[in-house]
Amino acid sequence: MLLKIPFAKVDCSGNEWIYVQEVLNSGWLTTAGKTHLLEKQFSEYVGGKFACAVNSGTAALHLALEAIGTGPGDRVLVPSMTFTATAEVVRYLGADPVFCDVDYATRLVTPAILKDALLHQPEIKAVMIVHFGGQAAEMETILPFCRSLGVRIIEDAAHAFPSRRRGKWVGSFGDITCFSFYANKTITTGEGGMLVTDNEALFKRCKVMRLHGIDRDIWDRYMSAASSWEYDVIAPGYKYNMPDVAAAIGIAQLEKADLLRQERERCAKFYFNNLADMDSIDLPEVRESMADHAWHLFSIVLNERSRVPRNRFIELMAEKGIGTSVHYKPLHRMTYYRERYGLRPEDFPNTERIWKGCVSLPIYPTLSDEELVYICKSIREILG
C-alpha cells in the first residue's frame, strides 16, 4: 500500500487555537502582551537573561550582527553548509562573509576547523556558529578561543531548540543566539524568530532596531503609568517585530516543546536502529546524548557505495509518496557567492562530500511507527 508522508508536518494539537482566539478577542493583534510573555517564557527556558521576539530567524541574525557593530569592511566567518540567510545578513550590513568547511560526520564547525580558519583569515570580526540539524557545536572550546582573539560569536540556532551542550541550553552561551520559528521548525509561530542574550546593551539595541529604531514600542507606551503617544527615533531601524497572533501560537508550542522533542528523538532512534547496517548510507553522528539533540533534521548521506545517485533517490522516494529534502546546497555553489568571492568546490572538501549525497528524511512528532517502517522499507528497496 502506498502511503503519503510529507517531509514536514506541524503539530497544533495544543492550546494554539485558544491563545490565538484570546488575541483576536482582545482587539490588539500586533506586538503586545502575548509577545512579551513569549519572550519571558523562552528566556527562562534556555537560561538567557533577555529575549527579543522578531518576525523571522533571518531578522534575528540581521539584528544580532547590527547590534555588535558589523558594517562595511568587516569580515564574518560563515560555514558554506548552511541556509543562505546566515550569509546574506552579513551582506545586508555591507560586510563580507568568509566561508569555511564543516565536519563531515556532524556538519558542524569544529574547534579545529575554526582555529584553522581564524589563523589563516585576518581581521575576522565575528563567527556565525550554526548548530546544524539540532546538535550543538562545541561551545565550551569555541567560546574561549574566539574571546582570546577578540572575535564575537553569533549563534545560528535555527535548528537548535531545544538543544544542550554539556548540560547548558543553546541560548546561554555566546554573545547573541538566534532562533527560528519558521513553519517547519521544532516549534513554530508560522513565521518568527527570537534573539537571546545576557548582554543588556545588545538586547536594548535589538529591541529598538526591530521596530524602526523607535525608543519605545506602542505596547510600552500604552502600558506606561502616563500613557503617551510620544516617542523618539534614535537610529534607522527595521520592521522586524513579532505580532501577538504569532506569539500566541509560540506560547502554545513552547508549552509542549519537551514532548515534541522527545517524539522527534523517537523517530531518530527508529532510523538509527533500522538503517545502521546499510553500508551505502552514512548516518548523522551524535557527539553528546540523543536527549541533548533537538532533532530538527535527520540528514543522511548516500556515500560512494550507493548505486543510486542522490537526485534519483529523491525521485524514487517521491514515487513511493515520501517527502524528502536537501540540507543544503552549499553556499559556495550558489551563483552570487561563487562569483562575488571566487569560491571553489575544492576548498570545501567535507561540504562537497556531504552535498553530493545528502538527503533529509521526514522527522516530526506525529510520524507514526507504521510510517517509519514504510520509510525504512522504501529506502532498502531503492538502495538494495
Feature locations, PLM:
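N-terminal "arm"/small-domain region of PLP-dependent enzymes with the aminotransferase-like
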Residues: M1-L29, Y231-I234, P362
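Phosphate-binding glycine-rich loop
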Residues: W28-R75, V89-L93, F99-D101, K168
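PLP-dependent aminotransferase class I/II
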Residues: T35-K40, G48-A51, A112, A126-V130, ...
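Conserved coil-to-alpha-helix start sites within the AMP-binding
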Residues: T82-A87
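Helix C-cap/helix->beta junction micro-motif
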Residues: L93, S148-L149, K320
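Short beta-strand->loop structural element characteristic of the AMP-binding/adenylate-forming
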Residues: D96-T106, S325
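Active-site phosphate-binding strand-loop segment of PLP-dependent enzymes
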Residues: A105-T189, M194-L202, P309
